[in-house]
Amino acid sequence: MRDITPDLCDKYESQVTLLNLPLQNFGQRSAFWGEIVTVRCYHDNSKVRDVLSQNGKGKVLVVDGHGSCHKALMGDQLAILAIKNDWEGVIIYGAVRDVVAMSEMDLGIKALGTSPFKTEKRGAGQVNVTLTMQNQIVEPGDYLYADWNGILMSETALDVA
């Protein structure tokens, strides 16, 4: 376990913004960071699967599920896919499922809540678009730093050492 965001705030206060969303921790990895990749979708996780199928080394996926906790946008199978493809973590403004299994996986996972319902698979959604969640903007290509203290974003990569 490692606290990174307090030190980053102390060192880079003028360069970071807080992604202030009421998210819970679901993955085993307590701290994670990387370049932001975005997906916007609603009750359809097809694009989430497409993105997590790609190499995620040094990247964090941020998913805008419109804040809906009716259907889970990620479960254990997508978490396994993310780990296989070296993703650092996933932030979901929506729901996840299979939370006991994911709690034992070495992946950073934060989400609004849980739902046992799966999503539809219609191929709907957008990839690498600017997201606005609770009046907060998330840009693909920026950098995200997360731990149990919070989530920070920066336009440039920061030294986490």
UniProtKB/Swiss-Prot annotation:
Note accompanying the cofactor annotation: Divalent metal cation.
Function: Catalyzes the aldol cleavage of 4-hydroxy-4-methyl-2-oxoglutarate (HMG) into 2 molecules of pyruvate. Also contains a secondary oxaloacetate (OAA) decarboxylase activity due to the common pyruvate enolate transition state formed following C-C bond cleavage in the retro-aldol and decarboxylation reactions.
Coiled-coil ranges from the UniProt annotation: none
Organism: Vibrio cholerae serotype O1 (strain ATCC 39315 / El Tor Inaba N16961)
NCBIfam families noted in UniProt: NOT-MenG (TIGR01935), PRK09372.1 (NF006875), PRK12487.1 (NF009134)
Claim: Kinase is one of the keywords in the record: no
Top-rank taxon, per record: Bacteria
Name of this chain's protein: Putative 4-hydroxy-4-methyl-2-oxoglutarate aldolase
EC number(s) given by UniProt: 4.1.3.17, 4.1.1.112
Pfam family for this entry, one: RraA-like
Cofactor: a divalent metal cation
GO biological process: regulation of RNA metabolic process
Subunit structure: Homotrimer.
Ligand binding (substrate): G75, D76, Q77, L78, R97
Residue sites binding a divalent metal cation per the record: D98
PANTHER family xref list: 4-HYDROXY-4-METHYL-2-OXOGLUTARATE ALDOLASE 3-RELATED (PTHR33254:SF4)
Keywords tagged on the record: Lyase, Metal-binding
